[in-house]
Amino acid sequence: MADDIPARRENWAEADFKGGAKSVIALKSGHVLVSDEPAGFPGGAGGENAGPTPTGFLAAAFAADIPVILQRIARERGIALDAIRARVTIAWNPRGIAGLEDASPTPFEAVSAVTLTTAAPDAEIAALKAAYEGRCPLYNLLRKSGCRMVEDWTVERG
């Protein structure tokens, strides 16, 4: 099975700026997304709220990645997960994005609330969590940037 997995995989996105804070983004997959800022966003570029902000997309990508990685690991280990729910909050200092010298634009905290519905024993859940922390690309990208990672795991017995 490991021989079937390539050593490199790429994804790409191309943003076409439409003015204000709006961009239309084409993805390698053929999907098209719109990114924008709310109108009147303090320090913003004058958006129309036509789509999520770029940092909103970051939170969405991380939230979507959590169940994908957990289910993959669970399947490999024979752990039955009846449901997976992930809520992610990413905090950053908008003063950094505005270019103020006293602030960094790098996200400083990522909070993930993960709820699993499963009959798996606690030891299997602990091993699943440890494997997830080592294998989730976005978790590791944020962690290695210095972002404080806060996790709240809940297990509902199914």
Which residues make up each language-model segment?
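Extended beta-strand/beta-hairpin segments
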Residues: M1-A60, R72-G158
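Alpha-helical metal-binding/catalytic segments enriched in His/Glu/Asp
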Residues: D65-I66
